[in-house]
């Protein structure tokens, strides 16, 4: 079957409700520095992933930490293809009509994780609004396959919102729940129309709360990117909403514009302010908070989960 058409950059954002005025990316402040890739390890890991026909969000979303994570032989695996059914203008993953789920992907994923001897993995996906359960059943199949091959490996999932199919999705995840459930709110509710067309703030909170109700012993986690025009008070209000919905773990990081056709960065939050947010999060009762310019939801996820469990 031929590869489907992938829209990125201007082709992706041209049909969303707001108009993106192309802007050159701002000069980065001195505190934002990604580590240069360790080329032998990066090439080796990419080779393993391509041979297994797997994708990583590290590559598809142009994550600034790719060099560091690949250099350590770790990655966040992206299942269900590399085409998203939505057009979020902050994200660098391509938009298009995806292929049906690959029935061999759970096996390929499990074999690759076993080959790499990973102790902690993050599994994420694009939005799959074309599937009746939003892809949750495929998540469960992947979790079960990994556990069969690597029973000691801990598994975190970073899910889409399963909007319009939440009950089906949660029922599917009941078959093979993860060790950590992560779903990112991404930004404050005032900015949802601009940053997350097709998503709903209250629905995302409900997903996290409903999963927690069904699996009270499994930690829940969420994250936001800062720099899209939100205020500090709005961030604190979202943090309070997350705690009110039983979320245990928090990540806050700096939004970086993938290209001139994506949403512009409106401010760079200082490391000192991130440190204050982290202290405020812990005071609210989060079991763990990772807040910093280069923090991403799956960055050092194993360390976050271990710290939360110890706390």
Swiss-Prot record:
Residues annotated as binding [4Fe-4S] cluster 2 are 84, 88, 91
Q: Which pathway does it serve?
A: Protein modification; protein lipoylation via endogenous pathway; protein N(6)-(lipoyl)lysine from octanoyl-[acyl-carrier-protein]: step 2/2
Instruction: Give the reaction(s) catalysed.
Output: [[Fe-S] cluster scaffold protein carrying a second [4Fe-4S](2+) cluster] + N(6)-octanoyl-L-lysyl-[protein] + 2 oxidized [2Fe-2S]-[ferredoxin] + 2 S-adenosyl-L-methionine + 4 H(+) = [[Fe-S] cluster scaffold protein] + N(6)-[(R)-dihydrolipoyl]-L-lysyl-[protein] + 4 Fe(3+) + 2 hydrogen sulfide + 2 5'-deoxyadenosine + 2 L-methionine + 2 reduced [2Fe-2S]-[ferredoxin]
Q: Name one GO molecular function term.
A: lipoate synthase activity
Question: What's the superkingdom here?
Answer: Bacteria
Pfam families recorded: LIAS_N, Radical_SAM
EC number(s) from the headed UniProt entry: 2.8.1.8
Key words of the record: 4Fe-4S, Cytoplasm, Iron, Iron-sulfur, Metal-binding, S-adenosyl-L-methionine, Transferase
Q: Where is the signal peptide?
A: none
Q: Where in the cell is it found?
A: Cytoplasm
- Cofactor stoichiometry and binding? Binds 2 [4Fe-4S] clusters per subunit. One cluster is coordinated with 3 cysteines and an exchangeable S-adenosyl-L-methionine.
Gene Ontology CC terms: cytoplasm
> InterPro entries per the record?
Aldolase_TIM (IPR013785), Elp3/MiaA/NifB-like_rSAM (IPR006638), LIAS_N (IPR031691), Lipoyl_synth (IPR003698), rSAM (IPR007197)
Residues binding [4Fe-4S] cluster 1, per UniProt = 58, 63, 69, 298
**Necessary cofactors:** [4Fe-4S] cluster
Radical SAM core domain sequence ranges: 70-287
Q: Show the HAMAP family listed in the entry.
A: Lipoyl_synth
So what family is this one in? Belongs to the radical SAM superfamily. Lipoyl synthase family.
Record protein name field? Lipoyl synthase
| Species name | Thiobacillus denitrificans (strain ATCC 25259 / T1)
- UniProt lists the gene as lipA
């Amino acid at each position: 079957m031929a590869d489907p058409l992938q829209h990125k950059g201007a082709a992706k954002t041209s049909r969303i409700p707001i108009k993106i005025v192309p802007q050159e990316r701002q000069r980065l402040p001195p505190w934002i520095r990604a580590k240069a890739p360790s080329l032998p390890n990066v090439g080796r890991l990419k080779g393993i992933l391509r041979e297994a026909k797997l994708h990583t969000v590290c590559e598809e979303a142009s994550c600034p930490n790719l060099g560091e994570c690949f250099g350590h032989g770790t990655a966040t695996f992206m299942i269900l293809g590399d085409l998203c059914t939505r057009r979020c203008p902050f994200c660098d993953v391509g938009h298009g009509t995806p292929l049906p789920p690959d029935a061999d992907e759970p096996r390929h994923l499990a074999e690759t994780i076993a080959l790499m001897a990973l102790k902690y993995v993050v599994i994420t996906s694009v939005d799959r609004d074309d599937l009746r359960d939003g892809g949750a059943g495929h998540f469960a199949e992947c979790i079960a396959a990994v556990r069969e091959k690597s029973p000691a490996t801990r598994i975190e999932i970073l899910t889409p919102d399963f909007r319009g199919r939440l009950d089906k999705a949660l029922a599917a995840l009941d078959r093979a729940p993860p060790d950590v459930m992560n779903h990112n709110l991404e930004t404050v509710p005032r900015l949802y129309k601009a940053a997350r067309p097709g998503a709903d703030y209250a629905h995302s909170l409900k997903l996290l709360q409903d999963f927690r109700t069904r699996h009270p012993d499994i930690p829940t986690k969420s994250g936001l990117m800062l720099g899209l025009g939100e205020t500090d008070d709005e961030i604190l209000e979202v943090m309070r909403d997350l705690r009110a919905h039983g979320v245990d773990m928090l990540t806050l990081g700096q939004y970086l514009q993938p290209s001139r056709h994506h949403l512009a960065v409106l401010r760079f939050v200082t490391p000192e302010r991130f440190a204050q947010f982290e202290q405020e999060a812990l005071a609210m009762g989060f079991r763990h908070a990772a807040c910093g310019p280069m923090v991403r939801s799956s960055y050092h996820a194993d360390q976050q989960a271990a710290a939360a469990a110890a706390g």
